[in-house]
Swiss-Prot record:
Location of region: Disordered: 1-43
Database matches in SUPFAM superfamilies: Zn-binding ribosomal proteins
Family (UniProt): Belongs to the bacterial ribosomal protein bL32 family.
Species of the source: Saccharophagus degradans (strain 2-40 / ATCC 43961 / DSM 17024)
BP-aspect Gene Ontology terms: translation
Signal peptide per UniProt: none
Protein name: Large ribosomal subunit protein bL32
Entry superkingdom: Bacteria
Stored InterPro entries: Ribosomal_bL32, Ribosomal_bL32_bact, Ribosomal_zn-bd
DNA-binding listed as a keyword: no
Basic residues bias spans: 7-16
GO cellular component, one term: large ribosomal subunit
HAMAP family: Ribosomal_bL32 (MF_00340)
Swiss-Prot/TrEMBL keywords: Ribonucleoprotein, Ribosomal protein
Amino acid sequence: MAVQQNRKTRSRRGMRRSHDALTGKTLSVDSTTGEKHLRHHVTPDGFYKGRKVVDVADDE
């Protein structure tokens, strides 16, 4: 098993963890439907940049 040779300081631990923060996904609001969606992705209704690009079938 690997065992550290020297104890790492709080500063070194913090510097290592400085890049581990999570970021939320950037959401946009569609201009036509007002629905939130991921950037550069089609909305679940089939709209992209305010235009209907995909015909979505109803599952009901």
